[in-house]
Amino acid sequence: SGANVLTFGAGSRLTVL
């Protein structure tokens, strides 16, 4: 589940950019 959290965080940052 840790990997899912990291992936979600990366996607969120990309969306912000």
Curated annotation (Swiss-Prot):
Where's it found, cell-wise? Cell membrane
Q: What is its main location?
A: membrane
What UniProt keywords apply to this chain's record, in alphabetical order? Adaptive immunity, Cell membrane, Immunity, Membrane, Receptor, T cell receptor
> Which cellular component, as a GO term, is one annotated location?
T cell receptor complex
Q: Which GO terms describe its biological process?
A: adaptive immune response
Q: Does the keyword Electron transport apply?
A: no
Q: Does the keyword Ion transport apply?
A: no
Quote the subunit structure annotation: Alpha-beta TR is a heterodimer composed of an alpha and beta chain; disulfide-linked. The alpha-beta TR is associated with the transmembrane signaling CD3 coreceptor proteins to form the TR-CD3 (TcR or TCR). The assembly of alpha-beta TR heterodimers with CD3 occurs in the endoplasmic reticulum where a single alpha-beta TR heterodimer associates with one CD3D-CD3E heterodimer, one CD3G-CD3E heterodimer and one CD247 homodimer forming a stable octameric structure. CD3D-CD3E and CD3G-CD3E heterodimers preferentially associate with TR alpha and TR beta chains, respectively.
Known function? J region of the variable domain of T cell receptor (TR) beta chain that participates in the antigen recognition. Alpha-beta T cell receptors are antigen specific receptors which are essential to the immune response and are present on the cell surface of T lymphocytes. Recognize peptide-major histocompatibility (MH) (pMH) complexes that are displayed by antigen presenting cells (APC), a prerequisite for efficient T cell adaptive immunity against pathogens.
Name listed for the protein in its UniProt record: T cell receptor beta joining 2-6
- Give the species this sequence originates from: Homo sapiens (Human)
